Structures are given as C-alpha cells and as structure tokens.
Amino acid sequence: MDEESELIQPQDQSCWAFLPDLCLCRVFWWLGDRDRSRAALVCRKWNQMMYSAELWRYRTITFSGRPSRVHASEVESAVWYVKKFGRYLEHLEVKFMNPYNAVLTKKFQVTMRGLLSCLSKSNNRLKSLSIQYLELDRLVWRNSIRSSFISSLSFFLKKMGKRLDYLNLKGARLTVEQGCQILDSLSYMRNENVISELNIEDYFSHHLAVYNSPQFKKTMSTFHNLVSLNLNYNCISDELLENLCENASTLRTINIKCHVHDPHGQVIWGMSWAKLARQATNLKVNFFFERIMKYERLARILLQEIPIRSISLRSCYFSDPDCSMRPTLIDLLPTFRHTLQKLTCEFNNNHESLDEELHLLIISCRKLFYFKIWAFLDVSFVERILKSQKERQCALRVFKARIYTNRYETNEEDKTLQEIYRKYRKLIESELSYFVIVYSVM
C-alpha cells in the first residue's frame, strides 16, 4: 500500500477527529444530507458516525407542487438516503405541497411506491407515519394514479401495521370505500391493530355522510388501543361512540372538526356521550367549528354530556346579520364552565356588541386558562379582562385579542392599549402570555 493511501496517524489528525461520540452525533444531527456526506469524508471515525442509527430515526420529505431543479435534486437525495438508511427509520413524515398537474402526482406516486416498497422490506422499527394534505379528490389525481397510490399505501400498512403506533393521514380527501380500505390494512390478518394515535381529520371528501356507513363503523371497531383520535363530525355516530366505549380504557383525547360543508345534522344521543365519558374517565374532547355559528346547529352538537376541554368558533370573516352569537355565549357555552379550559372565538360581529357576554363567560369558566378572541370589541374590554384577572375572578395564562375596527386610523385605540398595558404591566409580565392589537377591517 502506498503512502498516500495509508491512514493518517493519530498525532497528525485534527482534534476534531477525537470529538466524543455524543458530541459528534449532535454535530451530524444538525447537518443536512449534503453536508453529512461531506463530513463523512473527514476521517474513518466520522465516516462511521454516518451510519449511526440516531441520525436516521426521524425523516421529513417535502415534495413541492411546483418544483425547481434544486428542490427536485434535494427530494431525490432525501429519498435515496431514506432507502439507504431505512432500516433505522422510526418516524417518517411526507409532504406533498399543492401539485398543479397530473405529471407531478404521477411522479409522486411512482416515487412513493418505490420508497414504501423498500421500507417494507428493510425496516422493522417504524413507529409513526404522517402523509398530510394529499387532497386525492382533486382533478390532478387521475383515477389510475390515485388507485395505484392507495394500493401501494395499503400494501405497506399491511406489512408495517402491526408495529405502527401513530398514523396521520389528515387531508387525504378519500371516498368512504377508499378510506376504509387503507385503514383496514392496519388490521390485515388480525381483528385489531396497535395504533394509539390516529388523525383522520379531513380524511374523507366534503359532503360525505360517513356516519351512515356500516363499513366505516366496522373499520373503527378494530382500533382497540386508541389514546388520541382526530376526525370530522360527519364521522360521529352513536355506533362509533359505542365502539369507542368497548376499548375506552386507553382513550384520552378526541379532536372533532365540524365544517359547514360537512354533513352535521345527525342526531347523537347524550346518553352515548355520557356512557363514553364514564368508560373513559380521563377523556377530553376538543371541538373546532368552521363557519358553523348559529345557535341551533351548535346546540345539536355541543351536548352537555360531553367532557369538553376546548372549543374553537371561527367564522372565517363571513358575516351573517341574521345570526347572533349572544345565545351561544349566554346559554350554551356556560354549560361547560366546569370543564372548559381553552376558548377561541373568531367572528365578524359588526352587527352586534358582545363585550359584556364574553366577559361574563370568561369569569364563569373557572378552569379557563386560554382565551383567544378576534372580533369587533371595544378597547375597554381588554382592561375589564385584566381587572378581573387581577381580582382573581378568572385565571387566564394566555390572552390574545385582535380587536376589529371599521376605522382606517387606529392611533387612538393603540394609545389606549399602551396605557392599559402600562397600568397592568406587572400582572401581564408575571402571569400572562399576552398579545393584543387593533386591526382595521375596511
């Protein structure tokens, strides 16, 4: 062997060659793929670190819907490294951002088929899988491309489902049949699966009354180990709650999204929620409403038997002069004053003042620690909340407000807010995560 190919003697090496393994691993952990490959050429020890399982447990691959040459190269590199070090992978996240034509969805489908096939052969450690916002009901997904992707994912979950602990398919937008096909793969050749966290929010397409599907109810009966469940209200039925009751010992959290375009007129019995609350003694339910603001609709959904921890009401800037929030704030939400901990309100109430109703609601909910409000309010509302906090009538830890106004100039309101802040500065800095601004809505 000639001199140039001989290993460098220890006394000739840089001090970086003797960096402790723990420190060296952290250095590599923060490097991107390209820099890692370059660092691996420094010396034998650094090359060996490249094969440390610690570096490859977590992986995120982002596919752009409008890729540049640089981004395409980065994706190819990321996929190559996942295939090479896939045996160490424990947490995989895949993002596909707004594809604009069928060529890109086809390329994504082919890439994912190869990636999932490779992992199913080499990996036995994967604990979590996240593939969000695919929106498979869009026209850019040709039927053949969509079917091929669903088949690849289903085959992968059949092999990996017995070890998978976390699955996030938020925003997939599937038919009931397609969605159940994928979820059924988790319990292939078994009557149950070990998933503890399942996110199927916006998993099904808009306008689907999933709560009427016997297939969906049968599929959900195979989840015996759920701790956390995210889904839409158009999936909720008495039968689903009954299934959850049968395996309720582990259930802790249900996050429910209710969108105006999703069917939400089904009748759920309060006794079904009450039974689930008795079986799952630590259960907390969080509701997220989008453009569902009418009292009659909310009252059908927010039953007093539900152990509600959090409520989010968002109108998304839509205004309905015929819709009043007063009954909701006065009669409905106080029903949950003993359990409600987080409240988010974003609505266009230009036609009615709600300062007094909101203030009374806050001081009546004794466990409320998080309050976020975007609405037409008087600036004095902020001082009333801070005064109540000082007098221990409420126990907020987070207070965020965007005060809408129809005025173009907000100098006067800004000045008043500054005076309020100075007056309660000690309270704010010691007790609150505080953010309040005036926002002009023209």
Swiss-Prot record:
<dbReference type="InterPro" id="IPR036047">
    <property type="entry name" value="F-box-like_dom_sf"/>
</dbReference>
<keyword id="KW-0833">Ubl conjugation pathway</keyword>
<comment type="function">
    <text>Substrate-recognition component of the SCF (SKP1-CUL1-F-box protein)-type E3 ubiquitin ligase complex.</text>
</comment>
<dbReference type="InterPro" id="IPR032675">
    <property type="entry name" value="LRR_dom_sf"/>
</dbReference>
<dbReference type="InterPro" id="IPR001810">
    <property type="entry name" value="F-box_dom"/>
</dbReference>
<feature type="domain" description="F-box">
    <location>
        <begin position="16"/>
        <end position="61"/>
    </location>
</feature>
<comment type="subunit">
    <text>Directly interacts with SKP1 and CUL1.</text>
</comment>
<dbReference type="GO" id="GO:0019005">
    <property type="term" value="C:SCF ubiquitin ligase complex"/>
</dbReference>
<dbReference type="InterPro" id="IPR045048">
    <property type="entry name" value="FBXO31/39"/>
</dbReference>
<dbReference type="Pfam" id="PF12937">
    <property type="entry name" value="F-box-like"/>
</dbReference>
<dbReference type="GO" id="GO:0031146">
    <property type="term" value="P:SCF-dependent proteasomal ubiquitin-dependent protein catabolic process"/>
</dbReference>
<dbReference type="InterPro" id="IPR001611">
    <property type="entry name" value="Leu-rich_rpt"/>
</dbReference>
<protein>
    <recommendedName>
        <fullName>F-box only protein 39</fullName>
    </recommendedName>
</protein>
